[in-house]
């Protein structure tokens, strides 16, 4: 039988590219979670709009940021997976959101 940690770490990965219109709502849905054992990773494909300005507003809540050109969505997702250290992995892409502040509980 596996020992399950009573407070597992969630690695949440947001993959984004030129998503300034929808990204802030996504980030806010993470930073307002009442569950605290969350590792937040953002993988940006080298955005040329205001995406990084939004990301920088929340930098104290983002554990890892990668911003560089990639080979598409799945390449960016794989970068995030390699960086994740959590017990559980969740993709929450730009425009998605956790709709309640206790979603991870």
Placement of each model-derived feature along the sequence:
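Nucleotide-sugar donor-binding/catalytic module of glycosyltransferases
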Residues: 1-105
């Amino acid at each position: 039988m596996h020992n399950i940690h009573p407070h597992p770490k969630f690695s949440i990965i947001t993959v984004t590219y030129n998503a300034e219109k929808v990204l802030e709502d996504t980030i806010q849905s993470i930073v307002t979670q009442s569950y605290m054992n969350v590792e937040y990773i953002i993988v940006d494909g080298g955005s040329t709009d205001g995406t990084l300005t939004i990301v920088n507003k929340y930098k104290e809540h983002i554990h890892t940021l990668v911003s560089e050109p990639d080979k598409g969505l799945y390449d960016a997702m794989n970068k995030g997976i390699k960086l994740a250290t959590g017990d559980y992995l969740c993709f929450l892409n730009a425009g998605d959101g956790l709709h309640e502040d206790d979603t991870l509980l």
